[in-house]
Amino acid sequence: EVQMAWFGGLSGVQARRLVPGSQAIAQGLEDPDFKSYFIANTSTGLSPSETLTDAFVEQPSFTFGSKGSTSGRLMPEFYLREAFNQSPDQLFEKVGFSGDHSATIALVQSGAYATGAVNYKVWERELEEGKIDTDKVQVIWETPGYPDYHWTVRGDLNDKFGDGFTQRVTDALLAIDDPVLLNAFPREKFIPASNDDFAPIEDTAEAIGLLDAQ
């Protein structure tokens, strides 16, 4: 039985629905303003833009990351639907799910897919590590910010471990300042979070059919 877990935005919402009473207690400093990058192979001729353009969805193929990823599927699909009022399957001849962000970058860089969507932190890390050839793949559009990764605990921790236990766990997370520990996530530091912070994720998942409406 898991008492506490580090979730992405969507997986956290799903977990809290499965375990009523569970609480989001902390998130990374960066997480209230998380982003996805829409990327394209340079052979498409697409250029960076302030908006998603018709030229982007005129490309033949698009790949998400994991089907359950907030930054690699949920929010990118939301913004595609918002911009063009159609599902990805209606917009592109071929829609794929790479399984993870690194694979998405590799598939678009190789030309296996013309376009894709990735977690911005993975892109920035791999760019810094020299794994991305910007002569072959580039960022075309950046989404608005949205909430994502966070810590969630079961709602019965105080009953099992004593009054105030959940708050002590929260305080311990917020107090972490060891660079090695923080870099494991990687986050600059942790800040408070609540279930309400992730209402936009839940609403979006319901709107595109990934969650049943409550």
Where are these regions (language model features)?
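Short, glycine-/small- and polar/acidic-enriched structural segments
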Residues: 1-47, 120
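Periplasmic-binding protein-like
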Residues: 28-37, 131-173, 183-200
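Hydrophobic residues within well-ordered alpha-helices
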Residues: 1, 55, 108-109
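A ligand-binding cleft/hinge motif common to bilobed small-molecule-binding domains
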Residues: 6-19, 81-82, 109-110, 114-134
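Ligand-binding cleft/hinge of the Venus flytrap
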Residues: 53-59, 70-97, 124-133, 207-211
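A conserved helix-loop-strand patch within extracytoplasmic ligand-binding domains
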Residues: 28-84
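Ligand-binding clefts/hinges and TM-proximal coupling segments of bilobed small-molecule sensing domains
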Residues: 58-82, 167-214
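Short helix-initiation/N-cap motifs at beta->coil->alpha
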Residues: 7-10, 87-106, 147
